[in-house]
């Protein structure tokens, strides 16, 4: 990071010198974080840059805090990249970028078009998909349609680079390669020495002057991204509305697949901090509503957010930075997670001091979604994290406890009346039966919990890539055995398993709890291997064509059977908290607490007893590349995942939220600030926070989670008085995109309506941001709505 600070200053200094020499030269720079460093460390240079910004020649683009990874962060993190970035651009630079500028991230999630449009963006630019190793993307100028149906104008530079030197070869390649020249003659060329190389040079600027209108060559000139997108919109949307190219779904990068796994501590730290921020911001908002003496720690929370957003940069969170950067990021996570726990405790104590009904719960979590109506956003003594208690914190009665039986042949049977698991002496689960319907989840001859090592020796891009042929080199860790069986505190039973091979030691706990339809796996891995990649097998006796993977604000389906080259290229894919497979009559899912990489493939083999069919899910746990950090992930790591039987979508979301919710030593239980009472469908209230403007209003983030229509009534805490609610943009203002569906089915989305009982209506995977304003009779509102929030 220290060198990045210097790179920013060198590049801006170089660019400003070029602007002094050439009155037509323009330059675009993204990332509010870069401008903030420059403002703090080089105020004279910053002042010179501001003048060029006012002239329209130095062009802030992107509107984000940094050019983040786009597959791994939560949807809320992507939103905060925008809100923090745009706030800085507005307040410090006096501009509002119109488009997302992400030339170098490793894939783009299917929620981006909706997030971008609901933030007010008009266009999206990247060139990274041109790096695909298997197929060529079909367009350069098109409308990208997200999982919810939102569309955003998108352009890929046909030069297939973000670091052109403006050579004639590059210009001719760009013209020849442009796939949409039947509709448009306009494209962008990103030039300059990139990745900290200093930007454009005099020679490059001179080439643009020389080749501006050269006969027989593409015409080239200085311009701005907004000018380019105005032309592209005119060409492919306004002039040819019936021929506008459209691409729907995620932009999967057929490369850099190992970034879903490299530097696991980056993934675990990010997931933990995101979940803890959700709980902490909620408790701080509640303390502000309930207690007029509470001072909302806005500045400190903003600082923690900015550090998290920086650590989501597209080489840090994916695990492809140098060792020093990852050491600093790990220290950031440790420090900020500890501070967030303290802030949450302070807010909880403030609530308890003024609310007689705020019962303090020990070792508790606030779960944002539960399948049981009325349980969400209420502190509950939690099984998540510690795995010591059941979800309600009550002792299980004897006849509902899990019974563990050790057989003469060494097998162990766990039975809780809902599930029966049979664990072989080698520690793999050879049978898992749903006792409600007799469904066997494990294919014949297979075992859940078998670990495999792949050779991690990619042709290039060591920490970035895992090759397809690495999957052919998989070797099982067969030195594995059951060590003992123990009882949990509240009626469950745990089988302890040990597995070892050269450089790898694995201690696993397999637990079946009372009254649960999930089999839990808690694994500690001592990882000393080099150039190896660790996966765990989870075979399912379910024949399915496609698997469902959670992503930001919804899920995506990817093929299990690889019929096309594009299908084959998706041999390692991103999943957030769950992956689910289903046939016509049954579904199962795997829910995780900190992993992102996975592969899903068909099981198809013939045995003497008959054909065996099913689906193999494998979670990617650890990798060990030598570059750029030769000690990647050396050390001890802990993982948690659950196999969910009879996995309806509400049940899977419930399990995913419980497993990932932040567990705190003490949390006050009180009526939620806001809650959704479902009418039909699956709608999730994902985040509750105070508005950024210090007004004291609440901001609610809701979305439809499973791809169907959903209706729910909003309920708000009585302390908010006769509160009103209206829909707002992601920027928390009233500027709504008229082309996107509204959250309320009964009228103008910008009109304030009574919050209590307001009916929400969302389309598949629709996201909505709601602003709840306290009534004059509400709790601690003092009329001017300041309430010590600053």
Language model features by range: what are they?
Residues 43-63, 113-137, 143-152:
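Acidic, His- and aromatic-enriched active-site or binding-groove loops in soluble protein domains
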Residues 78-111, 118, 174-188:
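CE4/NodB-like, metal-dependent polysaccharide N-deacetylase domain
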Residues 112-117, 131, 140-141, 156, ...:
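C-terminal (or distal) subdomains of carbohydrate-active enzymes
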């Amino acid at each position: 990071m220290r060198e990045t600070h210097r790179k920013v200053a060198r590049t801006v200094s170089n660019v400003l010198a070029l602007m002094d020499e050439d009155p037509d030269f323009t330059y675009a720079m993204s990332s509010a974080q870069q401008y903030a460093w420059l403002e703090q460390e080089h105020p004279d240079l910053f002042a010179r840059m501001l003048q060029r910004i006012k002239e329209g020649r130095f062009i802030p683009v992107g509107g984000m805090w940094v050019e983040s990874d786009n597959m791994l962060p939560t949807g809320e993190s992507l939103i905060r990249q925008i809100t923090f970035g745009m706030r800085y651009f507005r307040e410090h630079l006096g501009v509002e970028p119109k488009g997302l500028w992400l030339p170098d991230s490793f894939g783009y999630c299917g929620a981006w078009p909706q997030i971008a449009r609901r933030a007010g963006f008009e266009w999206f630019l990247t060139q990274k998909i041109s790096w695909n190793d298997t197929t060529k993307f079909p367009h350069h100028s098109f409308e990208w349609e997200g999982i919810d149906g939102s569309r955003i104008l998108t352009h890929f530079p046909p030069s297939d680079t973000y670091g052109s030197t403006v050579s004639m070869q590059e210009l001719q390649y760009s013209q020849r390669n442009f796939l949409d020249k039947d509709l448009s003659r306009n494209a962008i060329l990103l030039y300059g020495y990139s990745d900290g190389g200093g930007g454009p040079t005099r020679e490059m600027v001179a080439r643009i002057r020389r080749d501006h209108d050269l006969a027989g060559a593409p015409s080239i000139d200085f311009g701005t991204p907004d000018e380019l997108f105005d032309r592209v919109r005119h060409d492919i949307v306004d002039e040819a509305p019936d021929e506008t190219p459209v691409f729907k779904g995620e932009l999967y990068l057929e490369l850099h697949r190992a970034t879903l796994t490299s530097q696991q501590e980056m993934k675990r730290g990010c997931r933990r901090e995101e979940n803890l921020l959700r709980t902490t911001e909620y408790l701080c908002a509640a303390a502000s509503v309930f207690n007029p003496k509470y001072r909302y720690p806005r500045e400190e929370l903003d600082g923690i957010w900015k550090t998290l957003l920086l650590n989501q940069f597209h080489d840090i969170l994916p695990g492809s930075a140098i060792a020093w950067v990852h050491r600093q990021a790990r220290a950031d996570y440790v420090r900020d997670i500890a501070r967030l726990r303290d802030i949450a405790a302070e807010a909880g104590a403030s609530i308890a001091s003024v609310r007689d009904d705020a019962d303090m719960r020990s070792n508790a979590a606030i779960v944002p979604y539960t399948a049981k109506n009325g349980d969400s956003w209420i502190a509950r003594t939690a099984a998540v994290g510690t795995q010591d208690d059941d979800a309600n914190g009550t002792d299980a009665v004897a006849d509902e406890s899990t019974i563990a039986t050790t057989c003469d042949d060494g097998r162990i049977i766990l039975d809780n009346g809902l599930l029966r698991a049979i664990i072989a002496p080698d520690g793999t689960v050879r049978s898992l039966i749903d006792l409600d319907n007799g469904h066997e989840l494990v294919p014949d001859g297979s075992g859940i919990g078998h670990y495999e090592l792949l050779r991690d020796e990619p042709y290039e891009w060591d920490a970035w890539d895992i090759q397809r042929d690495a999957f052919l080199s998989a070797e099982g860790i067969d030195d594995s055995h059951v060590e003992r069986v123990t009882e949990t505190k509240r009626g469950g039973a745990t089988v302890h398993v040990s597995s070892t091979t050269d450089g790898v030691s694995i201690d696993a706990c397999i637990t079946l709890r009372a009254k649960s339809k999930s089999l839990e796996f808690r694994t500690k891995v001592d990882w000393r291997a080099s150039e190896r990649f660790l996966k765990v097998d989870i075979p399912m006796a379910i024949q399915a064509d496609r698997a469902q993977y959670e992503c930001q604000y919804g899920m995506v389906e990817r093929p299990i059977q690889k019929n096309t080259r594009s299908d084959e290229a998706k041999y390692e894919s991103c999943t957030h908290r769950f992956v689910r497979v289903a046939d016509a009559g049954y579904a199962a899912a795997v829910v995780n607490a900190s992993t992102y990489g996975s592969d899903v493939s068909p099981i198809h083999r013939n045995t003497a007893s008959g054909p065996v069919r099913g689906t193999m899910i494998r979670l990617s746990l650890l990798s060990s590349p030598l570059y750029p950090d030769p000690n990647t992930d050396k050390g001890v790591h802990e993982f948690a995942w659950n196999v969910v039987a009879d996995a309806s979508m509400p049940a899977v979301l419930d399990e995913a939220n419980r497993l990932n919710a932040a567990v705190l030593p003490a949390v006050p239980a009180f009526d939620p600030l806001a809650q959704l009472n479902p009418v039909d469908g699956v709608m999730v209230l994902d985040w509750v926070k105070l508005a950024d403007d210090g007004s004291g209003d609440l901001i609610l983030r809701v979305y439809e989670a499973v791809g169907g229509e959903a209706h729910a009534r909003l309920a708000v805490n009585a302390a908010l008085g006769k509160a009103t609610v209206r829909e707002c943009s992601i920027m928390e203002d009233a500027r709504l995109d008229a082309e996107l569906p509204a959250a309320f089915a009964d009228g103008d989305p910008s009109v304030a309506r009574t919050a209590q009982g307001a009916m929400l209506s969302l389309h598949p995977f629709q996201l909505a941001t709601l602003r709840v304003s306290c009534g004059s009779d509400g709790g601690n509102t003092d009329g001017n709505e300041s309430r010590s929030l600053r």
